[in-house]
Structures are given as C-alpha cells and as structure tokens.
C-alpha cells in the first residue's frame, strides 16, 4: 500500500499504482515518486533494491520499463522528463522498514500535525515498535526515546553525517562497487505519447 511519504499528491499515487508493479517485477522497490511541475514537467522516481545498492544500470533498466508502461497507460497529459535515481546517502525514509534498517543513524522527522507542541524532531533512530517509529531526542539536557506513529509522518530523511557516509562506502566496497558515478541520476526524455531516450522535448 502506497503511503503519503512515497506518493503525496493524487497524481503521484495514481502513478505509483501504475509503476510499482513494473518496478517490483524487475526486483526493485519504489522509494518515492513525485510529479514536479514548472518550466519542464519532471517525473522523479527513487528506487532501490530490497537490500540496498542500486546502480546506474539498474536505474536505466527501471527507466526503460517505466517509460514503456507509461506509453500504454498515458497518465501524464503534458510532455515530461523522467528521472530515475537511487535514494542517495541522506535518503528519504518512506517505509516503516527504513526506520528499522537505519537504526542508530541520525534523522529528521516531521509530522503533519503538532505533537506535544512541535512538528519537527531530530535525533538518532531507535528502530520501530509495531506501527511506531522510535527516535532518541534531546530534551532538557537528557536523551529520551519517543514514539511517533508512522502515519503521523509527513516527511523523514537521514541526516548526512560522517558515520553514515562511512557506512555507505563500507557497504559499497563490500559489494565490490567503487564507482561513485553510481549515485548519478538517469534521465530520459518522455512524453504523454511515451517517447523515451530522446533529447528532444515531446508533446
């Protein structure tokens, strides 16, 4: 089931319904999707492997498969650019399991409504308990652990720290991946008619 952290707007949720099966059939998971309007409409997709470690070739495969599916479904009226990327080091946390996976690392959480007079919480993730995200925060000079229901969250992401960078590099080295270009985005041009891989804008 898609939550607001993965897809916020109605169009994002509609797109998530279309592309999630495509991404999962390839062995990946959807982390976040956003249709961004502006001078150029951009469909931003973040994806990952279940155990992490998505690479440029993976993003290209996802991009090609998603483009082919959007050719048929045609959910976007205007010309658009499709961007598929890894979540990055200071990644957004969009699934309950993310908070368990990154236990011990610093994160920023934001809730939709005020919780005890505040919406923003920053501290060390302490795992999950049922449907709650646990986080250690500083309060009156002491470290306390609080629980926030996952459904309360409107935004969540890791904080870029030396420890996090070292861990990500360690994982990449252990996986035999040393090419830092693997964090780059894969971009293809697309349109409501589904042209992909073109450098020209399509309408």
From Swiss-Prot:
InterPro entries from the UniProt entry: Ribosome_maturation_RimP (IPR003728), RimP_C (IPR028998), RimP_C_sf (IPR036847), RimP_N (IPR028989), RimP_N_sf (IPR035956)
Gene Ontology BP annotations: ribosomal small subunit assembly; translation
SUPFAM superfamilies hit by this protein: YhbC-like, C-terminal domain, YhbC-like, N-terminal domain
Gene Ontology CC terms: cytosol
Main subcellular location: cytoplasm
Keywords: Cytoplasm, Ribosome biogenesis
Region annotated Disordered, chain positions: 183-203
Annotated Pfam families: DUF150_C (PF17384), RimP_N (PF02576)
Annotated compartments: Cytoplasm
Entry similarity comment: Belongs to the RimP family.
Biological role stated in the UniProt entry: Required for maturation of 30S ribosomal subunits.
Protein name: Ribosome maturation factor RimP
Species name: Ruegeria sp. (strain TM1040)
